[in-house]
Amino acid sequence: MQAIFQALNFNPWTFLFQTLNLLVVMGLLYVFLYKPLGKVLADREARIEGNLNDAAAAREKAENILAEYRQQLQGARQEAQAILDRATKMAEETRAEIINRAREEAERTLAQARREIEGEKSKALAAIRSEAASLAILAAGKVLERSLTPDDQERLAREAIAEVERLQ
């Protein structure tokens, strides 16, 4: 075995010092590099995890707000439709009321016109009767001026009756 060690130029003291150097370097690397690097990675992982949780919470909150806004929008649409329906109903009622008032006013005007026509007709008939009576008196006066025969009297009576019937 010694022959192998001599062929390889193996020195146990060098090997021991190199092993100790390796262990010291590994210890120093562990203390100064691996632990801080592990801590940085753990902190980064925790920060990323927190950010993901915050993002999930923010997304859930945004979805809740969106759902609430959609519900409010639906409510606003329903309210707008209800207002539109009420306005349409009120417009129809107002239209019907205006039409009824116009119809009633037209009926009152027509009735007033009919009453005025009847009054004028009555006045005209009274005037005609008065005129007919005057004419009858005038005719009677003229007839009396001359002597009447029974045929003339009968003819005058028939004419007066016909005139009165015609005037009525």
Curated annotation (Swiss-Prot):
First-listed, main subcellular location of the protein, grouped into a coarse class: membrane
Subunit structure as annotated in this protein's UniProt entry: F-type ATPases have 2 components, F(1) - the catalytic core - and F(0) - the membrane proton channel. F(1) has five subunits: alpha(3), beta(3), gamma(1), delta(1), epsilon(1). F(0) has three main subunits: a(1), b(2) and c(10-14). The alpha and beta chains form an alternating ring which encloses part of the gamma chain. F(1) is attached to F(0) by a central stalk formed by the gamma and epsilon chains, while a peripheral stalk is formed by the delta and b chains.
Location of the protein in the cell: Cell membrane
Keywords of the record: ATP synthesis, Cell membrane, CF(0), Hydrogen ion transport, Ion transport, Membrane, Transmembrane, Transmembrane helix, Transport
Protein family: Belongs to the ATPase B chain family.
Protein name: ATP synthase subunit b
Domain of life assignment: Bacteria
